[in-house]
């Protein structure tokens, strides 16, 4: 199983994002861009204009995680900006197939994210069409939260739901990922890991990305 580490810049210094991204790019698979609108979650990160600048200047592919209302509008826009992957929240959407179709039409991967309280079975009709499932292991909205170990069973259920996974759907976890939690998430079946605080609070962020990959691969 291929392991992917995607540092979240939610925990980086927004005043020098280019530098912060450069610190981890060579060791990372993607950069995780959290987009919050202060509506779906009680926090705000970047407007569309700033997000487009970040995506355009990023030296490695961008994984855009949309914690916003009306993902029917936002998801295709972020694909158009050049995101390699666009993930929207199941709880915010009503027209799932429209989102999936439009994001794919713009050449991006599409993922569905689930809050901790949302069961895996709500996306059973879409697993054959999406490219990633994101299991939130914290409540979305803020970085630096503690890993919710009770979500490991949900990761196992998601891995089981993917079956033989001939389409290569990624199973991502986001929230509280660190050297002390990534092994259990990997054992449960996750293959793609978002890490924010653990990476950007480390003395050497790139070395931390490498360490996380090593632990998850063991």
Predicted regions mapped to residue ranges:
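Conserved N-terminal beta1-alpha1 strand-loop-helix module at the mouth
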Residues: 1-87, 92-95, 110, 123-130, ...
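Conserved beta-strand segments that form the floor/walls of ligand-binding pockets within enzyme
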Residues: 4, 113, 134-137, 172, ...
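A generic structural signal for short coil/turn motifs at secondary-structure boundaries
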Residues: 41, 142-145
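Short acidic, glycine/proline-enriched helix-loop-strand junctions
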Residues: 98-99, 105-108
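Internal catalytic-core helix/loop-beta-alpha segment
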Residues: 109-113, 117
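Short acidic loop-to-helix transition motifs that present clustered carboxylates
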Residues: 117-119, 178
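Active-site/ligand-binding-proximal alpha/beta "capping" segment
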Residues: 139, 146-192, 198
């Amino acid at each position: 199983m291929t392991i992917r580490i995607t540092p979240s810049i939610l925990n980086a210094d927004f005043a020098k994002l280019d530098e912060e991204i450069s610190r981890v790019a060579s060791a990372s698979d993607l950069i995780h861009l959290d987009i919050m609108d202060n509506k779906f979650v009680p926090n705000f990160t970047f407007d569309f204009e700033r997000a487009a600048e970040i995506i355009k200047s990023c030296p490695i592919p961008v994984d855009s995680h949309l914690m916003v209302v009306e993902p029917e509008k936002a998801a295709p826009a972020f694909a158009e900006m050049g995101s390699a992957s666009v993930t929207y929240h199941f709880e915010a959407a009503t027209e799932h197939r429209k989102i999936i179709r439009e994001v794919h039409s713009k050449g991006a991967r599409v993922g569905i994210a689930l809050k901790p309280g949302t069961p895996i079975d709500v996306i059973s009709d879409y697993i054959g069409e999406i490219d990633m499932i994101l299991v939130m292991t914290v409540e979305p909205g803020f970085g630096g939260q503690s890993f919710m170990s009770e979500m490991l069973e949900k990761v196992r259920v998601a891995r089981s739901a993917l079956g033989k996974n001939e389409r290569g759907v990624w199973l991502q976890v986001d929230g509280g990922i660190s050297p002390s939690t990534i092994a259990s998430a990997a054992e449960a079946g996750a293959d793609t890991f978002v890490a924010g605080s653990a990476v950007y609070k480390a003395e050497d962020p790139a070395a931390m990305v490498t360490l996380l990959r090593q632990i998850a691969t063991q």
